[in-house]
Amino acid sequence: MSYPQEVNKRRTFAIISHPDAGKTTITEKVLLYGNAIQTAGSVKGKGSSQHAKSDWMEMEKQRGISITTSVMQFPYNNCLVNLLDTPGHEDFSEDTYRTLTAVDSCLMVIDSAKGVEERTIKLMEVTRLRDTPILTFMNKLDRDIRDPMELLDEVESILKIRCAPITWPIGCGKLFKGVYHLAKDEMYLYKSGQGSTIQEIQIVKGLDNPELDVMVGDDLANQLREELELVQGASNEFDHQAFINGELTPVFFGTALGNFGVDHFLDGLTEWAPKPQARVADIRTVESAEQKFSGFVFKIQANMDPKHRDRVAFMRVVSGKYEKGMKLKHVRLGKEVVISDALIFMAGDRSQAEQAYAGDIIGLHNHGTIQIGDTFTQGENLKFIGIPNFAPELFRRIRLKDPLKQKQLLKGLIQLSEEGAVQVFRPLINNDLIVGAVGVLQFDVVVSRLKSEYNVEAIYETVNVATARWVECTDAKKFEEFKRKNEQNLALDGGDNLTYIAPTMVNLNLAIERYPDVVFFKTREH
């Protein structure tokens, strides 16, 4: 297959949702359709060893939530689909934001009993920054749901994106009978209790087909016809260009648990979602059709293989083709490196990548030299931009139970900060270690990983820090004066960048007023 054909058949997407909307279940079912796993493991099984395929870290296995981002590749409809799993529990980290910089489209999953929830709103704001095309799956139709028209209105008014229903539900809860496909004028009938296999779907052609009344009953059949008259009059038609621009979302209804409707959005994804897109770098825009290799690292994951203390850097291939043993330039370090052992992933199962194309995600073994945001090329000096680092909102001082393990603690924290799990600050005036996070769960994750991966027992104490900002100044003399007078509020982060740690917002605002030449940054590009 030629290079353009290889690139054009790739689809790289992530699933975004509020916790418990069914994202992990959908991930399972998607892999089932891609023949990647034989039976879909049910999440949160009581004492069962069947963990969902994408939740692979110890703490995730205990809690039944996906904390870290995994990558899964599978074939579907003559396409090669890369699914990036993002943490869905309510305390997610910047990892999630950064993963969204590595995809070309997203599937938004909504719990139809609840509608649009807070985390979905936050994640949609992130996709807006790049106008990412969005498909929508209204999940959990096997339960009692809100009125489908209401759900569409809510998405339109809160998320400011037009909805174009592609399928429409026939009943819900115990009366859920299937969906009607608006464009194909076909009904797909649902049978319960077949969630872990791909079921033979019974199809009824034509909305006026009397067979429909026999299959679902007169009441539901008439209700469906009435609803569809309204829907076809009041809702948007699917417009491919508006979808690509991120202005309109095709909406599918179904139940992930019952494994019904998942193939409908997969068909939509492979047919409509964009092939690998161009990416903006500091000096130019890089097109996916370019033959020379380029890619950027959007996440680092420590200890994916508990037997080896390894760290893997996940890289999105932007252009060109990776081949085993090729020589690449690590632009930030200005060094040529030979990459002979890159990995491709099938959620927890990894294998050596012989080759990879634009749109694919590969893993590089990282011995501490690769950072989030690093660019690799075939020699060109360019850096991909737009991979954010956020100022944390929560802070704790971390203390050892065994003071002799200070070295392991620092090593563990620096590694965890490099992979974006938390940020670490070392105040200039003492030997404290302050951990900053975007959400509370990250603190638990760090303590449990320090223990299981670095054999360090640590506890947290409160610390008088309200917020942090990275500081820079072009006037060296004024910067020195600023540093001298504010030493008690200055710290170095994991990458040795100078940071102002403020005990209160008032303190920060005063500092900003007093030192107009110093710039205080809330986010930092990697």
UniProtKB/Swiss-Prot annotation:
One GO CC term on file: cytosol
Residue positions binding GTP: 17-24, 85-89, 139-142
First-listed, main subcellular location of the protein, grouped into a coarse class: cytoplasm
Subcellular location: Cytoplasm
GO molecular function, one term: translation release factor activity, codon specific
Top-level taxon of origin: Bacteria
Pfam families in the cross-refs: EF-G_D2 (PF22042), GTP_EFTU (PF00009), RF3_C (PF16658)
GO-annotated biological processes: regulation of translational termination
PROSITE patterns noted in UniProt: G_TR_1 (PS00301), G_TR_2 (PS51722)
Domain tr-type G: 8-277
Keywords attached to this entry: Cytoplasm, GTP-binding, Nucleotide-binding, Protein biosynthesis
Keyword Transmembrane: no
Family classification: Belongs to the TRAFAC class translation factor GTPase superfamily. Classic translation factor GTPase family. PrfC subfamily.
Protein purpose: Increases the formation of ribosomal termination complexes and stimulates activities of RF-1 and RF-2. It binds guanine nucleotides and has strong preference for UGA stop codons. It may interact directly with the ribosome. The stimulation of RF-1 and RF-2 is significantly reduced by GTP and GDP, but not by GMP.
Official protein name in the record: Peptide chain release factor 3
Species the sequence originates in: Haemophilus ducreyi (strain 35000HP / ATCC 700724)
Organism phylogeny: Bacteria, Pseudomonadati, Pseudomonadota, Gammaproteobacteria, Pasteurellales
